[in-house]
């Protein structure tokens, strides 16, 4: 019996399974409690149980394997990991662990890890010799992440504009600057779908902080990847815990030479959460931001890097502007120069219902010559010269109309050459 397999089953089927196993009153329980009861029943019959999760080490030295299905929220189906196992395998918060588990004994509340089979999808012996993330050498992004799918659909137009306006590479630290209702969520969904389609080798994680519950459900259904969320009805401490778990998991995977991509919506709300949680230093910036509050969200965003030893961590985050809040403006100003790719969205374009509402002239990537071939780069620069005199609305309408005539950007450049 596998714990992860049970978590993927809908609640109605779990209740049916529980009824067959002779369990009662399951309909009134939370999903995690139902899973706990079913596993306990199977364990009594002597069946082997396996489970996995992401390790969170607490201050007392022991830890728990949390599940991404419940967005790393503590629950009855968490798996206890003893301090001796943590020391033996040199485990750290964020390690993805799978292994054999046992049911709780008399007086215990949680399932416990008996045997570690894999650490970060690798043998436990290999995990011990990994170089710490902080000791890895950061480089400029030099391997392109293409967004274009080449199927000629209207959704692909967004990806193609993105490829032209600001190319994304493995290890990019990108900021999508978005006013309200400019289509940032749609843009993130497009990026997520393009990555899943073109780069299935990358580990994709979508982190939604302070979002609406219905948007979380929509994102989970659309994105082939891990969607971790903390909705607006959760406390700030929960937003912080979720983001820490996601970034620690990403760092551990990069240590194992994996390419990880985090799409964060939004870094402004994350910074607000840290501002609430961090102890008051007495120094307050404009808009009510504590002087120490932005250190940890900057550390989150600054973790994005291309690594010389292999692997990369890409973070594409949205920053909110024009919300009427002075605090949001201060947070944006603090993050403004930290990224190496910027993609401003325009409210004017979105109000005319032209999507994607990208401000083409103001968007761009640093060191884009490392990501694009020289001939393609020349064509992109010529396109910028053509578009530069136009207003932001005219530029976007012109570009979308021309791109709609072709299926791929190469065809578009050929058409440009002929005309």
Swiss-Prot record:
UniProt region (RNA-binding 1), positions on chain: 61-66, 78-80, 108-110
SMART domains membership: AAA, CSP, Rho_N
Highest taxon, organism lineage: Bacteria
Start and end residues of each stretch annotated as RNA-binding 2: 284-288
Pfam families: ATP-synt_ab, Rho_N, Rho_RNA_bind
EC number(s) stated in the UniProt entry for this protein: 3.6.4.-
Entry keyword annotation includes Transcription: yes
Rho RNA-BD domain ranges (all copies): 48-123
GO molecular function: ATP binding; ATP hydrolysis activity; ATP-dependent activity, acting on RNA; helicase activity; RNA binding
Record keyword Oxidoreductase present: no
Positions bound to ATP: 169-174, 181-186, 212
Site location (RNA-binding 2): 326
GO CC terms of this entry: cytosol
GO biological process, one term: DNA-templated transcription termination
PROSITE patterns: RHO_RNA_BD
Alphabetically ordered keywords of this record: ATP-binding, Helicase, Hydrolase, Nucleotide-binding, RNA-binding, Transcription, Transcription regulation, Transcription termination
Subunit structure comment from the entry: Homohexamer. The homohexamer assembles into an open ring structure.
UniProt xrefs under PANTHER family: TRANSCRIPTION TERMINATION FACTOR RHO
Annotated function: Facilitates transcription termination by a mechanism that involves Rho binding to the nascent RNA, activation of Rho's RNA-dependent ATPase activity, and release of the mRNA from the DNA template.
Family of this protein: Belongs to the Rho family.
Protein name (Swiss-Prot/TrEMBL): Transcription termination factor Rho
């Amino acid at each position: 019996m596998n714990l992860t397999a049970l978590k993927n089953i809908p609640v109605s089927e779990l209740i049916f399974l529980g009824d067959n196993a002779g369990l009662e009153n399951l309909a009134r329980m939370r999903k995690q409690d139902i899973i706990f009861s079913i596993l306990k029943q199977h364990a009594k019959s002597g069946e082997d149980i396996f489970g996995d999760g992401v390790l969170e080490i607490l201050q007392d030295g022991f830890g728990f394997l949390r599940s991404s299905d419940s967005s790393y929220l503590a629950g009855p189906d968490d798996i206890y990991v003893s301090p001796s196992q943590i020391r033996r395998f040199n485990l750290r918060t964020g390690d993805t662990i799978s292994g054999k588990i046992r049911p709780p004994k008399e007086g215990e509340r949680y399932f416990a890890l008996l045997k570690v089979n894999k650490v970060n999808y690798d043998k436990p012996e290999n995990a011990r010799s990994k170089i710490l993330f902080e000791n890895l050498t950061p480089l400029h992004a030099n391997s392109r992440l293409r967004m274009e799918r080449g199927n000629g659909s209207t959704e692909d137009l967004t990806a193609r504009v993105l490829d032209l306006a600001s190319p994304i590479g493995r290890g990019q630290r990108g900021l999508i600057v978005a006013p309200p209702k400019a289509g940032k969520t749609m843009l993130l969904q497009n990026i997520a779908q393009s990555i899943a389609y073109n780069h299935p080798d990358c580990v994709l994680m979508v982190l939604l902080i302070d979002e609406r519950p219905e948007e979380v459900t929509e994102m989970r259904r659309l994105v082939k990847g891990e969607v971790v969320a903390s909705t607006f009805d959760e406390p700030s401490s929960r937003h912080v815990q979720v983001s820490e778990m996601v970034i620690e998991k990403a760092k551990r995977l990069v240590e194992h030479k994996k390419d990880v991509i985090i799409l964060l919506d939004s870094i402004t709300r994350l910074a607000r959460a840290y501002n609430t949680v961090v102890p008051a230093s007495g120094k307050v910036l404009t808009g009510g931001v504590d002087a120490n509050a932005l250190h940890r969200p900057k550390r989150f965003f600054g973790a994005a890097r291309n690594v010389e030893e292999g692997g990369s961590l890409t973070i594409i985050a949205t920053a909110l502007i024009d919300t009427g809040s002075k605090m949001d403006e201060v947070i944006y100003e603090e993050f403004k120069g930290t990224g190496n790719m910027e993609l401003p969205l325009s409210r004017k374009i979105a109000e005319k219902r032209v999507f994607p509402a990208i401000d083409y002239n103001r968007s761009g990537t640093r060191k884009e010559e490392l990501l694009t071939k020289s001939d393609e780069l020349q064509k992109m620069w010529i396109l910028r010269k053509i578009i530069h005199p136009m207003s932001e609305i005219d530029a976007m309408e012109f570009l979308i109309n021309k791109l709609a005539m072709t299926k791929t950007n190469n065809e578009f450049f050929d058409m440009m050459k002929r005309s």
